[in-house]
Amino acid sequence: MAADKPHMNLAVIGHIDHGKSTFVGRLMYDAGAVPAHIIEKYKEEAKQKGKESFAFAWVMDSLKEERERGITIDIAHKRFDTDKFYFTVVDCPGHRDFVKNMITGASQADAAVLVVAAPDGVMAQTKEHIFLSRTLGINQLIVAINKMDAVDYSEARYKEVVEQVSGILKMIGFKPSEIPFIPTSAFHGDNIMKLSDKTPWYKGPAIMEALNSLKEPEKPSTLPLRIPVEDAYTISGIGTVPVGRVETGVMKKGDKVVFMPGGAGGEVKSIEMHHEEIPQATPGDNIGWNVRGIGKNDVRRGDVCGHADNPPKVADEFVGQIVVLQHPSAITAGYTPVFHAHTSQIACQLIALNKKLDPKTGQVKEENPTFLKAGDAAIVTIKPTKPMVIEPVKEIPQLGRFAIRDMGMTIAAGMCMSVKQK
């Protein structure tokens, strides 16, 4: 059963039309995670619309189309098992808020598959996603050179694309020699579950084998305790029960904890998971817990719980490294968008633009730039408009990443480099 296997969050990244959805659909179908009757139904529908090649992509259909056709695919179907792990596919880019989801919280990916279409090679979005995944701390990567059927399974073309992608990976500190580059056709299923006879020249692993040889993510249980609060309930006879997912550290019954930025604290009376009381909670556990002396007004979404002797850091201001993904004009000092970090959403002001970086190499390109635009990477000083918990990414990576949102879109992604505490 899945619970006995280590769990991995897998991001599937790459340019919008390079076949990510078909790739994920095929992976899940071949791994037995999608009932055959659903696929048959899609094949039939796709055929009628003259879009036969979309059968697998339809498995991963975006919400809008699902609603139009009155079908929904439960998120549970985005899980699949291999011999070694059970995987959850976290949102593919292109899905709404991918970047925000990737940065904040539950969908923190442990590894990524980069899908690059053989006919097109590297596109702008390919670069952006590689850089972003690096910024977000993903350090295990598998490259699928997809749509090989469209280039007649040409080894020469495969080598050209490997060359292109390796160049970018090197620039941002990945070692191409440690990364499998797998020629695939998600539509035909080549080199997904097993090696294909259409690519006799390819000697590496198929996708499944590459997934099985990923390294299990280390549980950050030795780090200080941090539990971002998702919500707080009042339960009669018990009192106030905050709920959230343990990001780092271990919490035991009887521990003295504190909720920041508010500062209310007390002793842990009980911890519950899946409606059962447990003696301690470890990273990844979704729990409800009750703290003696904590009232309804002492704790809210966005607070972070930690041990009283090592409380979460509350920033008066902090220095962040950001990548600007999109902005209609330019960003200057004084800009005050909403920052999403763990479960908090707080307006923060960019009080200084310190350095502009070369997004490919991380080298300083310009000191004290006057503005930033889409595609720029920078070091900036940020002042939250109200108290906010954030941690340097080197100390507690799970609480060091953030997304910047404005005008209904993700403007930038970033990580906290240092905190000046209140």
Curated annotation (Swiss-Prot):
Q: Which CDD domains match?
A: EF1_alpha (cd01883), EF1_alpha_II (cd03693), EF1_alpha_III (cd03705)
Enumerate the UniProt keywords alphabetically.
Answer: Cytoplasm, Elongation factor, GTP-binding, Hydrolase, Magnesium, Metal-binding, Nucleotide-binding, Protein biosynthesis
Q: Where is this region: G4?
A: 146-149
One cellular component (GO) term of this entry:
cytoplasm
**Reaction(s) this enzyme catalyzes, per UniProt:** GTP + H2O = GDP + phosphate + H(+)
Q: Where is this region: G1?
A: 14-21
One example of the protein's molecular function in GO is: GTP binding
Note the NCBIfam families from the entry. EF-1_alpha, PRK12317.1, small_GTP
Query: What is the recorded name of this protein?
Result: Elongation factor 1-alpha
Protein's organism = Methanosarcina mazei (strain ATCC BAA-159 / DSM 3647 / Goe1 / Go1 / JCM 11833 / OCM 88) (Methanosarcina frisia)
